[in-house]
Each structure stands twice: as structure tokens, then as C-alpha cells.
Amino acid sequence: MASASPAIMESGTASSDEAQAAARQPAVEIAHLSKTYGALTAVDDVSFSVAEGEIFGILGPNGAGKTTTVECAIGLRSPDAGTIRLLGLDPLTQRDDVREVVGVQLQFGALPDKLKVREILDMYRSFYTEPADVGELIKVLGLTEKLGDYYKALSGGQRQRLSVALALIGNPKIAVLDEMTTGLDPQARRDTWDLIRGVRDRGVTIVLVTHFMEEAERLCDRVALIDSGRLVALDTPARLAAQARGGKQVRFVPSDRFDDRLLTSLPEVSAVQHDGQHVVVNGSGDLVNAVILQLAAAGITARDVELVSLNLEDAFVKLTGRHATEGAMS
């Protein structure tokens, strides 16, 4: 397989925080990781490292290879090629040592239906010599009133919150969280973000797998964008968004219908799309004036004109040609 070359790598002058992170021992090291299922290449020569104390995001649409990457990283799957180290440990040959330092919450984890929430927490707590404060975890995650409920009676969102608690209950040095806020309401999602920030502030390294761009922008120090099993970009959310802002985007409502070629003929315009009654134009240079003047010359008025500020989602679309909520496979 060809070696993956990220389309965007870290650039510019590193901040003092980034310099300190680079000087620390990597908590996670993945080199040339590949995994196939028959004719399907799920992970294609992916390499990255995560510094101790960093919140590192792995982003991409459903089916991009994110979950397979972390399942190989924690030893649940054997890669076809590549090396993985977690705090210097091999997750395949040093499983017991890895379990002592890594907490995991997987997207499709399941627990016994006939156990109560309290029993599950007590069972997991007993696995560790220095467990976390369970009361604090369940309070932040909104599970206090569910302690006496059976697992089978929990909603999808409640099961998700319990799985996050179980990943953190052992006071791990590395926490791997796969789609941790899927199924949560907006307030519960933000409460969970606050919890994760607090965990990181205590020195825990967080590997966060998500397709929620806002979550990555708010939480992550750096993000790896993965699409079709390949690493397409690796940088801070701010710098990835800044790359997307190398272009411009304007939205407006036209007073009358027009042929897209009216605008695509302009040198400043790279693309024209339609979003309901709005027209969305991407381009560069003096885009707004060029579009408005061209429309006016054709007798068309641009109403509700908005110059859009681009973000991490736009960076992902620019790099992959699709949104993170899209997916090719389950």
C-alpha cells in the first residue's frame, strides 16, 4: 500500500504548549497501521502520535476507519501491518499491562441486561486498586437516579453515559472514547465535555473518536481527519479551519432564478451550490463584490447577503469532498 501523506500537516510557529507537548514522551504511537476485511481496506497506512496530557481527536464520517483504528490501538483487533505503542506498551503482547493504564468506551459496547447500574459500577470499580470517585462521575453524567435501574431499562443515551463512566472509573492514564456523546441531549453533551476537560487537567491523555465537529473544535488540542481509511490531515482545529478560510463563501437569496454559469464564469468563483432558497458561492479574491456586480448586470438583486466564516467542518469538506455525517459503510 502507498504511504499516506496528510494533505495538511502542522505548520506555522508552534505555541509554547505545543512545544512542551512535543518534548514529552508520546502516550500513543501508531506507525503505518493497516487493516483489511476481505477486499475492503478499512485502515490504510495511518500514522500519528499523541502527546501525554493531550486531547487528540480522530474525526471522519461513519465508515471512515476511525473505530477500526482505535480497536487496533487498544488490542481488540490485530492489524495487518504497522506498530502500536501505548505508553511504550504493545497492546497485543502486553494486554494486562495495557488494561491497567487504558480506559476504553466503545461505540457498540454491551453490558449484562440483568445487572443494575450500581452493580455494574461496583464490579468495574473492583478491578482497580485506585478507582475514581464514582459519586462524582455519576453526578456529572446524570446517572445518580439510575443506580437502582437494570441495564436493560436504560435508554440509549443513558447506556452511553454509563459506558463513559466505566471508561474513566479506573483513573486511567489514557482514555479512549468512541463517539462518547452520541445519543446525548445538548446539555448532557456539554456536561460531558466539562468532565473530559477536568479529566485531562488531571493529566489523563484523551483519544476522542467523533464525527461531531463542534465537539472536536471545543475539546481537541489536535485532530486527525480520516476518510476512506486514510489520514488526510493532522493539525490543530484552528489551523485546519484557517486552511479552509483560504477560500471564501458568500450566501444570498436571489431576486430571480438564474443560470449558474452567470457566476461560474467569474474568475473569483470556484463553485455555486443551492441550499433551499439560498445560493452558496465559493471562491476567492473580492468574491462578494464580483458576485453582486455580476448579478446586478443581469438585473438580479442579491438579498440577505452573508459572508460565511468557515470552520472545521468546512475544512473536512474541502479535503474530502463530503461532510463528516456522511458515510460509505457501517
Language-model features: locations:
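ABC transporter nucleotide-binding domains
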Residues: 25-30, 35-228, 233
